């Protein structure tokens, strides 16, 4: 009887093994660059063509290989980095399995050119589909150059899963970003289709992070330095305002190796838990140094996940390290503002004097002033310079007193008096006007006619709760409306209608804004320019990863569109062949709608509530916001009385 189990041929096992190691061009670049760093290279140049499908070339200035070593490097499980079982648990290198080069060679046409410092000439090896075709001598500098051409030429099924050249190039750029941040002392150059995407010179960590993630983030980075026993945590953490909608900017490293470990990421998120909104992620570059025997990095094919011997201790150390920095950073050092009662005219006048730097006298009882009748110029008395002793805390406190007072118009002098007084010598003009009346609470609007009004407009407004919920009455029912969710639903339906027509209404910016993106974000933006234009965003490439933002959706406020754009790029970057733009367009419109309305607490006037209810009546309204949260809840009189045990 014939056996059903058989030994697979070598060429097939090589392809299976390559499937674990070589997922896309970025996987090839990762293996080759890590080998270059392990070889002690101080400069790495990565070049790709057609997103890496046509060419991936990595050049380094490392120690190089002899002829015999170069030939052995193409054999499976051949490595110079470990020799015994003990070595496997005391790793100090990025690679150790001896699988990278043979796996890459089995699915490409590969050329290795290498030379050591004690050799006069180098060695060049050409392999195709995992088989060595040619070995010869060559002239070159010390180091190694590996060229990978026609990736997946013999595995067409895998080739079908590759995405566009822009997307694959973005993944290579993101991979190099991770490695460049981990080794700021090494120079990195990345070229895509002959164009230099970035060149990172050797620098300190902060300069390297700014180079890779954008200069705009540099002023928001704070250093981490923490040690507990044999565990050390260092790096940089960014202010909460730099947060992202996904964890793509969590750059975490164990002994110099980039990882995506759940324990490490959870510790960082716990440290930020009181600083970020739900669903937001910080920007960090955190390095953990621990004895190699305390961590196992050989638990995942990509080595992105690790296993700690003392998981709880590592988690707490990372959380404490990040928390200790966040507790000392400027966004917590704000002067406390004491609660004040409703300000009076006297309070407001005193507050204005403080905000003017104490250069003007505090208000006194108004005295009548004779009218100006002379045609002669009016000389102004010399202002006496005074040293202001008003602290910033005092300024912050009294600003609150001005909240209910509108600035009064300042009447100008008649023309014959204007030429004789200069701005440098004149005291501030303070006309003796009648006291500014304190704004009284608005009276309730008249009850709308239920027959003429829609459902929401017919509600009787009781007031607001916690500056977040509108309390209304309809008959004997108590209706509670989440004002943010309601605003969001209205904005979403408006955007959806515009998008269905052709595109979202865009507002051109008077002064285009310069925006810096990461390499992956820039690649996503370049690929989806047309879709972003339909959403109302107008971009123009400015060079490298810098873009000019020239237009935004009309519904977005001036302070929200930067965060919105980064969130949308994060969403677009997650698209795959099975998930097209049309599948997420409503999610993107919902995100724009969410960013276009006021978040948090806000006191609404009766006029604003009436306008909101009118918009809700005119909208094809749903009982939930675009994210699924309810817009309103209704309590019947019976339910309320049951709460108070009346029935």
UniProtKB/Swiss-Prot annotation:
Biased composition annotated in UniProt, kind: Polar residues: 413-423
Function: This protein is involved in the repair of mismatches in DNA. It is required for dam-dependent methyl-directed DNA mismatch repair. May act as a 'molecular matchmaker', a protein that promotes the formation of a stable complex between two or more DNA-binding proteins in an ATP-dependent manner without itself being part of a final effector complex.
Coiled-coil blocks: none
Family of this protein: Belongs to the DNA mismatch repair MutL/HexB family.
Keywords: DNA damage, DNA repair
Example GO BP: mismatch repair
Region listing for Disordered, in residue ranges: 356-391, 407-428
The keyword Plastid is assigned to this record: no
Name of the protein: DNA mismatch repair protein MutL
GO MF annotation terms: ATP binding; ATP hydrolysis activity; ATP-dependent DNA damage sensor activity; mismatched DNA binding
InterPro entries, per the entry: DNA_mismatch_repair_CS, DNA_mismatch_repair_MutL, DNA_mismatch_S5_2-like, HATPase_C_sf, MutL/Mlh/PMS, MutL/Mlh/Pms-like, MutL_C, MutL_C_dimsub
Gene responsible for this protein: mutL
Signal peptide: none
SUPFAM superfamilies found in the cross-reference section: ATPase domain of HSP90 chaperone/DNA topoisomerase II/histidine kinase, DNA mismatch repair protein MutL, Ribosomal protein S5 domain 2-like
GO cellular component, one term: mismatch repair complex
